[in-house]
Amino acid sequence: MKKASSQPRAIYYVVALQIWEYFSFYGMRALLILYLTNQLKYDDTHAYALFSAYCSLVYVTPILGGYLADKVLGNRMAVMLGAFLMAVGHLVLGASEIAPTFLYLSLAIIVCGYGLFKSNISCLLGELYQTEDPRRDGGFSLLYAAGNVGSIVAPIACGYVQEEYSWAMGFALAAIGMVAGLIIFLCGNRHFTHTKGVNKAALCARSFILPNWGWLLVLLTIAPLAIAVLFWQEWAVYALIVATAIGLAVLGKIYRQAENQKQRKELGLIVTLTFFSMLFWAFAQQGGSSISLYIDRFVNRHIFGYSVPTAMFQSVNAFAVMLCGVVLAWLIKESIGGNRSVRIWGKFALGLGLMSAGFSILTLSARWSAAYGHSSMPLMIAGLAVMGFAELFIDPVAMSQITRIEIPGVTGVLTGIYMLLSGAIANYLAGVIADRTSQSAFDASGAINYSINAYIDVFSEITWGALACVGLVLLIWLYQSLKFRNRPLAVGS
């Protein structure tokens, strides 16, 4: 007999697709900066610019992807189409080793696929439950854990295949993973018949000279080409400026629509959290760019005669997030009493403090490299693990606060704005920071020498920058704590 508490059968197909999507996305991401510098011979400045532009735009396109799913495609079709585009993009990226002109187009296709997939996979999962279904939270926890499994395995597998075979095979493995996830998902198609499908009436309705399905085909053709031009001409920053201006305008409109002081205070708290989260992720996203190149150039990666591929180090962060997340969920229970705002700022201070500690370890590693030529692998792993642990005190806290806001009908919009600023803008800032490590010179034989001092300076500055953020957050925390403590006295007087 089937237990009432068991999850719906369809969730396991969604989870399988999520695992393979994370495998595909993070497997490619672990290779990208190394591919640009080591294979295509981009200088660091050019590589950082393209890498940060790519990582920024993947947080912008989900806004359009969510709109298309709501109006025309439905979540299930949007997810399948997004998975297909990402698989195609990874295959084209592998071909760019032979024809570098495919590079910008492949990244653009992946960005479009990610936009259709990322904004709708969670919505599809939500469709599997009734509003008050007690299994809902467990389903989303399972989806989150599944993603971490994919992001742990991907850099190891893709890094190994790239090292042993070729760059094209590394990217092809990422594509194969996405195709495998899509096939598994399609095998469970019968379990999704109750979910929202394609809106055929909207798809066939005529707008101007074409039916909407015609406009959809035009969009799916033009969007990758337009994004490829943004990458090619390094115009992605202008797209970010436009998106940010729109996001801030919407935020201002929400603030004006707030009905009372409590709602405005809640919105102010979310804005402040978003600002500190943006800085946090500008520091944390060094992991895929400057830190990755530092490991490749200055860390002794040999163990028992085997050279550990640089891409594999990307798994450390994801493993730390998963392991520490399980431990925290077991050890920590949210207190019912006390001031929630005080607890929020305490967690943010801890997260930023751990980020500072992680970069202080990386600074020590870089100084070791300057003194002895190479740093040790355990020291590098320790720094990355601490940085991964720090993530648990930032995004979950901010997202929880957004879902609690009492202004009706704005949770989804605020989530999109949060992802725009803490994702897209933070990745752009991360590229600006990473570019400061791109100091190099040529020796007498014509070989390029990279400056370890540049890494020391940047890692040290991030350490102190994160620590300064901790100081600001602690001031806010202290103010909120004293304000809450004195409240009964004010009432009693």
UniProtKB/Swiss-Prot annotation:
Q: Which membrane topology describes this protein? A: Multi-pass membrane protein
Q: Which UniProt keywords apply?
A: Cell inner membrane, Cell membrane, Membrane, Peptide transport, Protein transport, Transmembrane, Transmembrane helix, Transport
Please give the Gene3D superfamilies that the UniProt record associates with this protein: MFS general substrate transporter like domains
Pfam families recorded: PTR2
Q: What residue intervals traverse the membrane?
A: 14-34, 49-69, 91-111, 138-158, 167-187, 212-232, 235-255, 267-287, 312-332, 344-364, 379-399, 413-433, 458-478
The record's family statement is: Belongs to the major facilitator superfamily. Proton-dependent oligopeptide transporter (POT/PTR) (TC 2.A.17) family. DtpD subfamily.
> What is the official name of this protein in its record?
Dipeptide permease D
**Species of the source:** Citrobacter rodentium (strain ICC168) (Citrobacter freundii biotype 4280)
Q: What is the lineage of its organism?
A: Bacteria, Pseudomonadati, Pseudomonadota, Gammaproteobacteria, Enterobacterales
